């Protein structure tokens, strides 16, 4: 998973599939960002085509961790099929989701 920066905002580019096989890798990299003191994170889903319930759990854990640490995590560039999964799971109510990375960065 690549991670870019825009000022003090970290932008992890979420891998194409986040499922039971890959969720731990994604979680570890996101946890590294938070434990490294990053408090503004934009998760870029432009490369992601699929997320399972295991993947959703990773992002829910990250949201809770960021809220505890006084940080913010937002999502951007979700493809329609991925957005539908977030909608069906009720996660669209929990996360701020933006069409573009630029909009997401402005929110932080």
Walk through the language-model features, giving the residues of each.
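Short beta-strand/loop segment at the start of cytosolic alpha/beta domains
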Residues: 1-13
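Short acidic-hydrophobic, aromatic-tinged amphipathic segments that line or gate anion-handling sites
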Residues: 96-100
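Amphipathic alpha-helical interaction surfaces in cytosolic regulatory modules
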Residues: 20-94
């Amino acid at each position: 998973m690549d991670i870019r920066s825009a000022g003090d905002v970290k932008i992890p580019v979420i891998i194409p599939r986040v499922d039971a096989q890959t969720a731990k890798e994604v979680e570890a990299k996101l946890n590294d960002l938070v434990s490294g003191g990053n408090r503004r994170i934009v998760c870029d889903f432009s490369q992601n085509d699929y997320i399972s319930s295991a993947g959703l759990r990773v992002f829910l854990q990250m949201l809770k961790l960021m809220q505890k640490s006084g940080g913010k995590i937002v999502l951007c560039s979700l493809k329609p099929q991925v957005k539908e999964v977030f909608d069906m799971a009720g996660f669209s109510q929990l996360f701020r989701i933006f069409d573009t990375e630029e909009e997401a960065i402005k929110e932080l």
